[in-house]
Each structure stands twice: as C-alpha cells, then as structure tokens.
Amino acid sequence: MEKNRFTDTFRTQNTGKPLPLPIIDWERIGYTAPTVISGEYDGSSAPLPKADVVVITWTSAEWNAFDHVFVNSSSTRYPDDRDWEHAWHTYSRNIPSGMSTDNTSAPLWGLYRVIEMKTSKKKTIRVLLFKCDTHLAHPPYASGLEQITGQLIDETGCSWIWSIGTAGGSKESENLGDVVITNAGHIQLKLSENLSSGLNNKSVKGTAFPSTKLFSTVQKHLFFDMTSVVTWPVLKSMFDELQQKDSGAKSLTLNDLVNPPLDPKNLKQSKIVPADGKPLLTTDYYYIASGAEAAKWSVLEMDDAVIGYVAQQKKTSFCFSRNISDPIVPAKAKGKTIDDSIRGDWSGDIYSRFGFYTSFNGALATWAALTAM
C-alpha cells in the first residue's frame, strides 16, 4: 500500500533504524519536560479524565513523534520503535451499535495519555493527549469524527482542543518541516458517506489564537534539522525507486520534482508560521495542490475543520498545528503536465521518508504554544 496522509492509519511494521529523533534538552530553553500523570485509567469504556486542553493527533508517524515530545523525551526515538505504545490507554466509550472501522489494527475511538505542563506564567495545565483512530475519510466517517470530538470536549471539560499532525503544502513558500498554526478551516467533501452530514462547504474561524512568544526560541534551539535527512543522495535514491514503480517517471529528471520547498538548501532552519484566521482546507480525499490553485488555504489536511466545527458549536476554543510533511509537488516539467499518479507517488514517498521528522517539529510547535498559555 502506498503510504501518505490518507492511508497512514495502520500500525507500521519494523523497517530498520534510520536517524532517530534526539533527546530533547528542555533546559536549553529554560523549561522542563512534561510530567506524565499515572493512575487515571478506569478502563476503555470509562469517561475520559478531566483536562484543561485536549491535543489530538492522527497517523502513526505523527503519534510516534507526539509521544516522543510530550511523554518520552529523555531518550532517542527511531521511526520503528514501538515499545512505548503499550502505555497508552484505549478508549471505546459509547460506540453506537453497528458503527465500525475499516482498520482492525486500530479500533475506535483511539488511545490517550494524560500529562501536566508548566507554562511560562508558572501555571500548571493538564493536557489529554489523544491518538485518534476515527478519521473523516474512513469508516465511520463524519458522524464518527463528530461524535468523538464531542465526547472529548464534554468528558474532559477542556477549554481548548487542538488537532496536530502532517499536512500538504498549499504554496511553494511552505517548506518541508515547517509548521503552520491556524484557527480556521473549510470543509470540502466528496465521499457519499459524508455528503449527508451537512458539513460540505462549512467554514469555521476561532475567536482565540495562541501566543507566539516561544516560537522563535523553540524553532531555533529544538527543531529537527531537516538537512540531516533530506540530502541529494537520499532524494536521488527515492527518485530511482519512483522510476522503478512508475514507468511514466522515466521521462523525468530528479530536478523536475525537486522544487524550492523540497530543496535541501532551503531546509536548514524550519519555521513556525502563525496563520491567525487563514483557513486550512479539510478534505475526505487525498488532495495535492497544483500551482497556485490552493494558495488561499493555509495547508491541506483531512480532519481539522470538522474538529473546529464541533468545538465552535460547543463554544470551545480550537486550534490546528500542521507540519508540512509533503510540500506542493511540481505540476509541470519542461512545459508538459506531470501525471497525477507520479505526483501522488512522489508526495507519498516524501511523507513516508520524512513525515516522522516533520511531525517532531509539529509537536514541538504545539508544546511552545501550550507553554505560552
């Protein structure tokens, strides 16, 4: 199965050990690691514990980096490390009769941990971290995603709900590894299972936006240096593999597919991009931007605006933190249109190879926003 933001919902297998995520030196920026709260679990059908903030993540790569930043930052973390997963608590409360998922490795609704964080104002906030296995583009579709969002808000009593994870770039200025933070979104649906939801073409915009005061410090001192994994030899190897699996790519060169947001010379320092009020685009299909057609969106992803819609109904503040795991892909080479299947494969390959590292940046950016509360 080709892996991308749409398909990466299954537990991944051991694939060897490439470069790990580093131990996080919180003291370097004058802070300490989040503290894990134990003894809060009464079984998968019990209500969720109370929390000030809920932070949701989605894919396997995102979840791995999420745990590393918020739970286990004192050791290195490889993409195929899995021992940490068993400490997460399953949550399956109030699943309607007949509601199911297409993913036997990740049953509804998902898994969680509870942590406490010290903020810059010397307050302590309690955060429920949630690995959501309920997706807009997979059964139980919009109805399931709306229900779990409502339960997360109602049971925790949170004042903020965040959704964080990987995203497609909407413009060439969004480099691989950058993180876009927004409080607005627009929903665009195609699946018949979702069209009856009444959510198609709905837009949301939050009234609150997080403080940005720690962003520059965190990106400078803690972000992953993408040039340590995105090199021309690595890109050449990926391109050779692309040509092997897609004969249409044989007419292309590597330079045809490496545009500015993927060029290693532009990736030394990833950045956090605040986008207060600029909507991301939420779809129930895998969408890769072409040219300037998607520039009006902050990023492209597949769940968030539904989270925001439910939160808005419940008068709960919401925010989205999306790391660029697959930048905008060139649409033409030497004046000729590049086939969509080639662009899709290349986008998926970039996500598969680098999404773990971009997700680390995304989780750190979220930590920075929460700590500045």
Region locations from a protein language model:
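Intrinsic-disorder/coil detector with helix-boundary
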Residues: 2-346, 353-373
